[in-house]
Amino acid sequence: MQDANAAFAQYPSLKDRTVIVTGGATGIGESIVTHFARQGSRVAFLDIQDGPAEELIIALASKGCPRPLYFHCDLTDLATLQAIFKQALDALGSIDVLVNNAANDQRHSVEEVTPAFFDTSIATNLRPQFFAIQAVIPAMRSAGRGSIINMSSISWMIPSIGVPLYVAAKAAIVGLTRTLAHELGPHNIRVNAVLPGAIVTERQRRLWYTPEYKAEIMASQALKRDILPDDVARLVLFLAADDSSAITNQSYIIDGGWV
């Protein structure tokens, strides 16, 4: 179990840094937004879940954190995504950190995938990451720095059945991360990937985290405890902070020792 009284890192370099998080209203994204706000960062986040987004903003404001900006955005609509990123960049005035977190792991078999479902899955789990990066590059290049953190998954590294398109997209994100790290490195823009394992979010608890699935996870992990959204968020903070200024082109697994 985690120590409830543990003290975690505060990163001075993240104070007043500007951050955009996709899929920031719930789950891992909510924890990422919360952790950046606690660091004193200026955060904007995108999501399609207005209710949870507003609840998060109110909760953070009540704790004295900088009030994050929320933008309703369907990431599968590319024109809307590009327009919202322009609005977010205009509102923040600059961009130091991009966290490409949004995804959808809807279960699907090979047989039931239609061309339309294929396109929607890629338009949710891969295409937005590329075009979000494209949107922030000019501002990061002008600033002479930036940290881009792409959320992949260990799903492509283990026997994952029932989510072939999700797995394919998550594998592609690692390739995208590696090539862009080299392309953007000369501009002091770092690009890294985070590969979570079985993270116990509220959605996972509601849909799939049965006693049988938990037993499978615990049999696979070296650490015999739930891996939580906060665990992922703390890794993201490190990769965003100046403490990791020499780190790029890396893929960090956070799965309790499953892989």
Q: Which sequence ranges carry the predicted segments?
A:
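Active-site helix of classical SDR
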Residues: 133, 169, 177
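Substrate-binding pocket helix/loop in short-chain dehydrogenase/reductase
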Residues: 109-110, 114-122, 217
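C-terminal substrate-recognition "lid" of short-chain dehydrogenase/reductases
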Residues: 130, 145, 226-254
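Short, small/polar-rich loop/turn modules that mediate ligand/substrate recognition or access, typified
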Residues: 99, 185, 190, 247-249
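Alpha-helical segment proximal to the catalytic Tyr-Lys
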Residues: 138, 182-186, 245
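Residue(s) in the substrate-gating loop at a strand-loop-helix junction
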Residues: 153
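Short C-terminal tail/terminal secondary-structure segment
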Residues: 2-11, 158, 237, 248-259
